[in-house]
Amino acid sequence: MRKTLLVICGIACVTGLHAQDVERTQDGAKNFIRTQNVTEEIRFYSDDIVRVIKYPSRHLPDKKSYPVIKTPEDVNLSYTEQEGNLSIKTGNMEVVMDKNSGKITFKDVQGNLLVQEKEFGTNFIPCKDGPYDSYRVSQRFMMSPDETLYGLGQQQTGKLNQRDQELTLRNENTRVCIPYITSEKGYGIYWDNPSPTVFSDTPQETSFNSEVGYMSDYYFIYKDGTQDGVIAGIRDLTGQATMLPLWTMGYWQCRERYKSPDELCEVLDKHRELGVPLDGIVQDWQYWGCDSNWNAMKFMNPRYINKMGDEAWMKYLPNGEDPNAKYPEPRIKTPKEMVEYVHKNNAHLMISVWASFGPWTDQYKELDAMNALLKFETWPRNAGVHPYDPFNPKARDLYWRYLKNLYDLGIDAWWTDSTEPDRFDMGEREFSLPTADGTFRSVHNAFPLLSNQGVYEHQRAVSDSKRLFLMTRSSYFGQQRYGSFCWSGDISSQWDVMRKQIAGGLNYSLCGIPYWNTDIGGFFGWEYNNNWKDVAMQELQVRWMQWGCFMPIMRNHCSSPMESEIYKFGEEGYWAYDA
């Protein structure tokens, strides 16, 4: 009898310990799981959005979220406890916490299963992040076997359904990596960790596994079982998509690169002569000159300022160009004249600016003095060019201070290139380089968000009467709030590559970011020897152009020596031109 009483008392004490460790909070619940030494919190941001965080201690780590700008609302929560579970309901969803294992289950208000964590599916493995102690953090879920998943940004696999694969989510040219998935069931999960992350889906589990982090941190979004509802939740959580200027919705012509103001304006003239609508034209790189002067944000190339032959300016001639070449007397002699000519002819001008600087530039020298350069190899290689640190607010201030010179010149739109940023020969030292917010590794995928944020916020501070238009090569969750559209990077001119962009663009858009496009015709024309007279190349260009009509932004582009203006493919009456 005495032993029986002791056992009963022991069970009561253990049950009591678990009960004491589960706390109902103003916005959800908090649970300390003794067997795992893990604290988990459920925090409702609205009826549609709930945040789940877990960390291996009793003390909440300090963590910044770059995409999330919403503050939690007051949500009417209904609590129910039974059989070791705590159920919390809002008007749109039910979240169930297993108080012993910490497993979280998500249901709709009718009690139908949406998705659930795998039991004991949160893992923390101690590791080093440069000089800091950190963890490899993973979270595993269990999806329905026949469920389709979308999202993950813009990949180059050609897969629309993201099941049955493993992907390393680390931004690079042609791959935009967003740790967000959305289901045909009408829910979305955003894994809030910007370090390189492996997404894996097998018949047994679906998981996110990040290189470094101090907590498992994700947001579950569910409204009415539709993608409209999920995307509304994304915009509520991370910011509304800005309205782009009306003129951005027309046709854009771009080439790598127009090599003088006359060359750019002659392309505009030809479109006007042919009666082909053209709303925008793009000035690509090297208007600043040579690689050492990379991204000076000034017109210093002597061909742009009528200084060919002037010894003081010839040192800025782009690498590989002939200093003895003879050119006719320019019709348009200054950048200001070029901008005014474009505007006079009812078009708009976009210009290329990068997230890196050459050692001759004033920006490089100032950023170096404030330890705001990331000193790893980037494009162009072997030129001493380095990316800046957009996580440093003072570096973003400096970036705009120089960019404003081009804004004051009348430039209409920004091509913020290489916002991954480009990187080569990366090892432990390079990924461990410090930023203002920790190691480069720990914040890597958020680089494009912060870099575009700097341009957007500074220009809006100067004038809120002019809408922004930023074309950028990389992106992150929430980037729709910064007036930017992403293109799919420097892809090659091939049918299979074109096909892959379709799935990439759809999955990117399902991450809540509506503005996206490709280089119409592809960037690298190697497959056809950069020959626009090749009939096979013309066929590809025509089909891509037809698809381009349905992209959010219609922009023709190619790499030198290819030329892709439509009149290069023939005259009126020739099938490729007429199509």
Question: Which positions does each model-derived feature cover?
Answer:
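Catalytic-domain carbohydrate-binding cleft regions of carbohydrate-active enzymes
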Residues: N112-A579
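Broad, structure-driven detector of short, well-ordered beta-strand segments within folded domains
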Residues: E40-F44, M93-K99, I189-W191
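Noncatalytic nucleic-acid binding interfaces
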Residues: Q20, R34-V38
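Hydrophobic or amphipathic alpha-helical targeting/insertion segments
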Residues: K89-Q116
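Bacterial Sec-dependent N-terminal signal peptides
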Residues: M1-V22
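A low-complexity, Ser/Thr/Gly/Pro-enriched, surface-exposed linker/loop concept
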Residues: D21-V22, G28, R43-S87, I125-C127
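Generic recognition of long tandem-repeat/solenoid scaffolds
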Residues: A29-T35, V52, G84-G91, I104-K107, ...
